Amino acid sequence: MQAQKIRIKTGIEVLKEQNFRCLEGKRVGLITNPTGVDNRMRSTIDILHEAPNVNLVALYGPEHGVRGDVHAGDHVTDIKDATTGLPVYSLYGKTRKATPDMLKDVDVLVYDIQDIGCRSFTYISTCLLYTSDAADDSLRV
């Protein structure tokens, strides 16, 4: 097979192709940053928020925030997302661990962050901490 004919699909592309079936009827929390995009560079936040059969209820931002507007090393605060109006919980603020209050309205967590595999990046540890928190609260990831 020639490399030019190989098409890589990200998770959001697969979810779109499946019409988000696995998220239907669930309250969805999204852990993401600006790397969470589809093949047209549309934000996963906006895609899930606009999908009629997805109930996106909360966003979770790692270092740099969900929209990438926080400098490296700065603490990220809990805010409302200006575009969607959804609550944005910081994963890089006063606590690096999810509190029960952060997860109380969520049935399933979607993690959409690309990582380069560099040990100085905090995204992989964010994934580990939140999948652990999800398991503790019987949430699906």
Kindly label every feature range from the protein language model:
Residues 1-4:
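Bacterial Sec-dependent N-terminal signal peptides
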Residues 7-54:
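N-terminal phosphate-binding or glycine-rich loops at protein starts, especially the Walker A/P-loop
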Residues 55-63:
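Short internal beta-strands
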Residues 61, 111-112:
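Redox-cofactor binding/interface segments in oxidoreductases and associated redox assembly factors
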Residues 72-105, 118:
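Glycine-rich oxoanion-binding loops at beta->alpha junctions
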Residues 115-126:
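Glycine/threonine-rich flexible loop motifs
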Residues 130-137:
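Conserved small/polar residues in nucleotide/adenosyl-binding loops
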